């Protein structure tokens, strides 16, 4: 039972993000900021590029939830088709981080286990990062229209009030980056926004269906993780590289964890050699991206109403491009 309940504290963090972003959106507190950005760049798409870039590189746990909350303030309330596109943007904008951040275990573990410097790791992974960034930019460019983005320039909100909303959020993100408890930070932030806005029916901002779904997904992921040792032993005994590729992908798909997928990739690299590192990383990363145990697709589906089929089409093309790129850079 304790195993199944592991990591469920994430739900407290998510509820805090939902309440905070819901109050900001319903009161249009960020309208002056987005309006100012729009005046400067003259394009709603460029505002989305900027917001998704900033929220996507936050070195914090639960980045996809924070990013979703911020992007939600740019989406129309009632246009389901427009809103659904932001679930994809949220996903793409927050998952290139695993390919480059020196603060992320997907970079730290290869550096430690394979005795590589950061630049050496990036010498293997930069083609995958380049493809991912290009794909993200193209998705926003091609799939998102100006009409899909809601920036209301007519709303007149005092700059002082906007400051009292923005600075506590920035401070909270700063505390997250510094390593403080995210559950406590966003619980306090949501209480502050409730009092500031006098929106005491805060529970209406919480997506209870999403909370229930994430609870079940986390339970399933925790149960599967009890078989980690079985998967690891099986992989160690693989002598055929192509079978190792298949099983590595499948196990990463089942486990749905960034720590697990990079562990498998590094283990296979130790067995078969450094020239296959980018390939193993790409395969295990791809398995992780589409894993049913991966909470991020659930967040986008329930937060923005993004259909699973839309995720499937976008992610399938992305992982095909990543794997093809990885195969093409293998040094024979």
Label each PLM-derived region with a short phrase:
Residues 36-39, 88, 204-214, 265:
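Cytoplasmic-side transmembrane-helix entry/capping segments in multi-pass membrane proteins
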Residues 6-10, 36-49, 78-86, 162-163, ...:
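Membrane-interfacial loop-to-helix junctions in multi-pass transporters
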Residues 76, 129-138, 188-198, 286-293:
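Alpha-helical transmembrane segments and their membrane-interface exit regions
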Residues 40-70, 238-288:
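Hydrophobic alpha-helical transmembrane segments of multi-pass integral membrane proteins
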Residues 1-12, 137-227, 331:
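Hydrophobic transmembrane alpha-helices of multi-pass small-molecule transporters
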Residues 26-29, 39-43, 73-87, 110-119, ...:
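Juxtamembrane helix-boundary/capping and inter-helix hinge elements in multi-pass membrane proteins
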Residues 2-28, 45-53, 198-230, 237-254:
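Core transmembrane alpha-helical segments of multi-pass membrane transporters/permeases
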Residues 84, 102, 106, 121-134, ...:
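C-terminal transmembrane helix pair
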């Amino acid at each position: 039972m304790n195993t199944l309940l592991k990591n469920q504290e994430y739900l407290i963090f998510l509820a805090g993000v939902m309440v905070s972003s819901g109050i900001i959106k319903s009161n249009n507190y960020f309208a002056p900021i987005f309006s100012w950005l729009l005046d400067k760049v003259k394009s709603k798409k460029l505002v989305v590029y900027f917001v998704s870039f900033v929220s996507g590189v936050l070195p914090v746990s639960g980045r996809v939830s924070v990013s979703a909350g911020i992007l939600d303030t740019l989406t129309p309330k009632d246009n389901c088709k427009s809103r659904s596109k932001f679930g994809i943007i949220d996903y793409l904008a927050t998952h290139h981080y695993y390919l480059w951040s020196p603060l992320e275990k997907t970079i730290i573990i290869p550096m430690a286990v394979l005795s590589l410097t950061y630049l050496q790791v990036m010498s293997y992974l930069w083609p995958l990062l380049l493809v991912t960034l290009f794909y993200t930019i193209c998705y926003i460019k091609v799939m998102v229209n100006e009409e899909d983005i809601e920036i209301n320039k007519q709303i007149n909100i005092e700059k002082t009030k906007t400051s009292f909303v923005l600075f506590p959020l920035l401070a909270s993100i700063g505390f997250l980056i510094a390593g403080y408890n995210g559950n406590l930070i966003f619980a306090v932030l949501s209480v502050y926004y409730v009092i500031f806005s006098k929106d005491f029916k805060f529970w209406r901002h919480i997506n209870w269906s999403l909370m229930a779904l994430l609870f079940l997904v986390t339970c399933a992921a925790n149960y599967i993780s009890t078989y980690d040792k079985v998967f690891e032993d099986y992989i160690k005994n693989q002598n055929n590289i192509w079978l190792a590729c298949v099983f590595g992908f499948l196990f990463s798909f089942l486990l749905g964890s960034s720590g697990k997928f990079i562990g498998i990739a590094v283990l296979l690299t130790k067995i078969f050699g450094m020239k296959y590192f980018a390939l193993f990383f790409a395969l295990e990363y791809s398995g992780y991206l589409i894993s049913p145990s991966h909470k991020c697709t659930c967040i986008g589906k329930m937060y923005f109403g993004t259909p699973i089929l839309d995720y499937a089409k976008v992610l399938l093309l992305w992982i095909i491009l990543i794997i093809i790129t990885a195969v093409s850079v293998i040094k024979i």
